[in-house]
Amino acid sequence: MAFLKKSLLLVLFLALVPLSICEEEKREEEDEEKQEDDDQSENKRGLLSGILNSAGGLLGNLIGSLSNGES
């Protein structure tokens, strides 16, 4: 009977070790995907702010030239 208990414990232990390793790899992959998503979001925000700054500068120049032309 003791032999069966030891065998069962060994089987359970050997099943839990790979399961633990798989969970760790899964967490690492999820972290990498999250990091990639964050990087893409930062790139999009940087591009959008660059476009808005350029548009604001052009609009400011246009308004400035219109007001100088009226004087």
UniProtKB/Swiss-Prot annotation:
Organism of this sequence: Agalychnis callidryas (Red-eyed tree frog)
Positions of the propeptide segment: 23-45, 70-71
Gene Ontology annotations of biological process type: defense response; killing of cells of another organism
Pfam family, one: FSAP_sig_propep
Entry GO CC: extracellular region; membrane; other organism cell membrane
Subcellular location(s) of the protein: Secreted; Target cell membrane
Tissue expression notes: Expressed by the skin glands.
Region described as Disordered: spans on this chain: 25-46
Highest taxon listed in the record's lineage: Eukaryota
Residues found modified as Asparagine amide: 68
Bridged cysteine pairs (disulfide): none
Keywords: Amidation, Amphibian defense peptide, Cleavage on pair of basic residues, Cytolysis, Hemolysis, Membrane, Secreted, Signal, Target cell membrane, Target membrane
Family per similarity comment: Belongs to the frog skin active peptide (FSAP) family. Plasticin subfamily.
First and last residue of the signal peptide: 1-22
Acidic residues bias locations: 26-40
Name the record gives this protein: Plasticin-C2
Role this protein plays: Neutral peptide with no antimicrobial activity. May act in synergy with cationic peptides by enhancing their activity. Has a moderate hemolytic activity.
Domains as described in the record: Plasticins have huge conformational plasticity. They can display random coil, alpha-helical, beta-sheet or beta-harpin structures.
